[in-house]
Amino acid sequence: MTPFAYKLPIRALWLGLLSLLLVGCQIDSEPKSELEKIRERGVLRVGTLNNPLSYYIGPDGPTGLDYELAREFAKELGVKLEMKPAYRLSSLFPALKNGEVDIIAAGLSQSEERLKDFRAGPAYYYVSQQVVYKKGDWRPRSFKQLVERQQTLLKDNPELAFFSVVDDSHFEHTLLAKQQKYPDFQFHVDSNSDVNDLLKKVSQGELLFTMADSVEVSLSQRIYPELAAAFELTEDQPISWFIRRSDDESLYALMIEFFGNLKQSGYLASLEEKYIGHIGAFDYVDTRAFIRALDTRLPRWTPLFQKYSAEFDWRLVAALAYQESHWNPYAKSPTGVRGLMMLTLPTARSVGVSDRLDPEQSIRGGVEYLRRMMERVPDSISEHEKIWFALASYNIGYGHMMDARRLTKSQGADPDSWADVKDRLPQLQQKKYFTQTRYGYARGDEARNYVENIRRYYQSIIGHLEQRQLATGDESIEDLTVIALDEEFFNEEANREILDEEAEALESESLENSESSAEPSAKPSTESKN
């Protein structure tokens, strides 16, 4: 065999190894997908807005609709979550474009301007854009009327703060499109304010008009009851997350699958119920009375709510107490319930309350009773929804609440979903249905309204305290409401006089405003506990 014969296989071997090496280099040089980058980093970076709906730091840590969704998405990826809140909308999309965040989850709509440069995920709820004004002021019924009014007012007062929107918002994009038809219309783009800042200015008469999403308006009315929607400027628009546009489909595909699974499992519906399910008809008169009570009554009872709230958020306990008694320790009803937490005599005895008119005993007893209801709520119900079932039990009784769950199941709906069960609660007072139940007739519509009112009061308390925090610059929300209790306040006669004066003032204010209010007044239920 010639030497050349040996060289052929050796040369072939070297050529094969070289080819493998080149292929390996080519594989290594291929760019990583977005998913691979995130998993390799071990962190999902989420841009969001700091507000009660999307993301904020509560007493128990981070919370918010977009936060909870992002937390579940990070679990799906098997990485940690890093929320990167922005205080100005205009800084969010540049951060996404520059690669500082992986996604934006901030309750933003799919405007045409955004979809030019970014990709939107699946819609998870819908909103309309509304023109907002101060109740009692002139109300435009259309954009044409608004433009005509502006021309009249600015002719006499060119410096008038007429219409402002947030910089780089979908409201700005909508108004720019409107200017194509109404070129004389003028509006101010505010780069130093967020939507809540502008809504506050409208409520205080510092600005005539602004724009906000329908959900934002409903939530803000619980803090600023003077706000009202003049008219809708758009149809319902989808709210979604956003990612960068690229040829890489990996992150987008997983996002589609993620939201699809959430919808199918019912988890998305339960989160929406938690954060926006309580939004209902706005009651101007009741809300004004509540806002006033936040300043005149809540501070006196805050230390006791904080002391006895135990595993509950003290602000939720405060909302429950307002629904029961309007924070009046001497409240009583014809059915025999009385005190700050409106306990029946049997319930009071069962939780060790000897004097239902003693505020401290009443709060302690009410929280203990709520805790017992929580313990009885079935474990099949998700943790974040258990409280609504417990509150319904607090009002209507555990047996009736379970009857409503059984009715829900018999009708093919989910007995562990508060959204499904609350729709069946009114059936407890319809003969067609309550004759099928174990405990019979109950005022189920009141129980449903009872829980929804507490949820609204709870969100209002949170928003009110946050506004006071911003106004004072104090980083401790709790310290804002903890006011030293005057010893005289625990003198029963002196306390009664104070409360009687407040009650008269609230009643007078309600009567004055009820004539101009077209919305029905939702009164708190005094349904006895059982």
UniProtKB/Swiss-Prot annotation:
It comes from Vibrio cholerae serotype O1 (strain ATCC 39315 / El Tor Inaba N16961). PROSITE patterns: PROKAR_LIPOPROTEIN, TRANSGLYCOSYLASE. This is Membrane-bound lytic murein transglycosylase F. It is a peripheral membrane protein. It is found in: Cell outer membrane. Keywords: Cell outer membrane, Cell wall biogenesis/degradation, Lyase, Membrane, Signal. One of its GO terms (biological process) is cell wall organization. The active site is at E324. GO terms for cellular component: cell outer membrane. PANTHER family: MEMBRANE-BOUND LYTIC MUREIN TRANSGLYCOSYLASE F. The N-terminal domain does not have lytic activity and probably modulates enzymatic activity. The C-terminal domain is the catalytic active domain. CDD domains: MLTF-like, PBP2_YfhD_N. Residues 28-279 are annotated as: Non-LT domain.
